[in-house]
């Protein structure tokens, strides 16, 4: 399995809007992606950043999702700072 790891910055006052966009757009799109297994989206305690870990069956699936994530417009107040594909090497 492979993970797409995305890190974002969230502008002041935009956390609720970012969460709404996440629930209404990002998560449903991720679920439909080829090879999707599971996804986790996290927010920093201060609400200024977030990190997601989305698991895919194959490296090409994760790479395609990463390309889409990098090419898609972010919600207002959200800036994508990194998109990486990593191999899942252990699971508990």
Language-model segments: residues:
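Short S/T/G/P-rich N-terminal loop/turn motif that feeds into the first structured element of a domain
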Residues: 1-50, 57-68, 78-92
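RNA recognition motif
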Residues: 69-73
